[in-house]
């Protein structure tokens, strides 16, 4: 689907994600539709109302509405579709710029911020945690994919995928990333990493990270970027993108959930994808 008048790369990606999710829903709910000009405004409104009924925030539904209007050349408004208005008081705690975010200079924490955005790690991994990241925390498989080994909340271990768009920046932060074969089980991965971490010496990647930085915002952005990345990978492999969990592809959500260290897809949708 192509729509004129989109000049922002981020807007393009957001609209594309909405189009993919809407198409998945349409295939299940209205299988007789084969071409775009068969789609009616009523069906688009039905989709938006369904998203709202599933508990998505006003922000998420507000994001979908202009995307469908642009793609399908509709002029749906919230009043017509009986959609809730977005309230300032209900905006999630992690906006792109919060008041306290303005009290620090991002340039002083450029590498830390890049790392957090690229990996979706919690604050404790950047600074202060038992397994605060070291150079040995980051590794690459034989396909060139980069991962970071993390032990965070509750002592849970995971290998989180580094977003492809940050790959070059991560390689600058850690110039000589170890290449290795992943182990067959998560338990073996955890054991190997903890031994490596214990014997690797005291050098950490970062020595400071102000609490004024809203790290949760970076995790939320990581979740959205990672989901989009997985959708694109699945499409590239000719896989079918489903809307089988609250408008999202369940398999892609599961991987995002693992990368975030939750392993609960409802948490991803309710706290990160909005």
At which residue positions do the language-model features occur?
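DNA breakage-rejoining catalytic core of tyrosine-based enzymes
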Residues: 80-106, 154-165
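C-terminal catalytic core of tyrosine-transesterase DNA break-rejoin enzymes
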Residues: 217-262
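The alpha-helix within a helix-turn-helix
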Residues: 116, 127, 257-258
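Short, basic interhelical loop/turn and adjoining N-cap
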Residues: 133-137, 262-268
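Conserved tyrosine-mediated DNA breakage-rejoining catalytic core shared by Y-recombinases
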Residues: 128-172
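Basic, Lys/Arg- and aromatic-enriched nucleic-acid-binding interface segment
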Residues: 96-124, 247-250
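Active-site/catalytic core of tyrosine-dependent DNA strand-transfer enzymes
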Residues: 163-231
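N-terminal core-binding DNA-recognition domain of tyrosine recombinases/integrases
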Residues: 1-86
């Amino acid at each position: 689907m192509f729509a004129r008048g989109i000049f922002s790369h981020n807007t393009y990606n957001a609209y594309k994600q909405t189009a993919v999710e809407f198409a998945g829903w349409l295939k299940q709910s209205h299988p007789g539709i084969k071409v775009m000009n068969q789609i009616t405004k009523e069906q688009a409104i039905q989709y938006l109302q369904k998203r709202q009924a599933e508990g998505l925030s006003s922000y998420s539904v507000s994001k979908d509405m202009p995307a469908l209007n642009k793609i399908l050349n509709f002029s749906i408004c919230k009043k017509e579709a009986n959609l809730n208005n977005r309230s300032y008081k209900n905006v999630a705690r992690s906006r792109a710029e919060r008041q306290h975010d303005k009290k620090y200079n991002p340039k002083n924490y450029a590498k830390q911020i890049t790392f957090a955005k690229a990996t979706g790690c919690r604050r404790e991994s950047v600074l202060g945690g038992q397994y605060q990241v070291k150079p040995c925390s980051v590794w690459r498989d034989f396909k060139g994919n980069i991962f970071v080994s993390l032990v965070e909340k509750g002592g849970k271990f995971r290998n989180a995928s580094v977003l492809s768009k940050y790959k070059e920046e991560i390689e600058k932060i850690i110039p000589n990333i170890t290449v290795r074969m992943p182990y067959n089980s998560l338990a073996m991965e955890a054991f190997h990493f903890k031994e490596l971490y214990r014997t690797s010496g005291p050098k950490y990647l970062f020595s400071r990270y102000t609490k004024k930085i809203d790290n949760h915002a970076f995790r939320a952005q990581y979740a959205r970027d990672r989901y989009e990345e997985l959708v694109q990978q699945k499409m590239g492999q000719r896989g079918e993108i489903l809307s089988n969990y609250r408008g999202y592809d369940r398999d892609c959500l599961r991987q995002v959930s693992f990368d975030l260290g939750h392993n609960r897809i409802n948490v991803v949708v309710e706290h990160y994808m909005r």
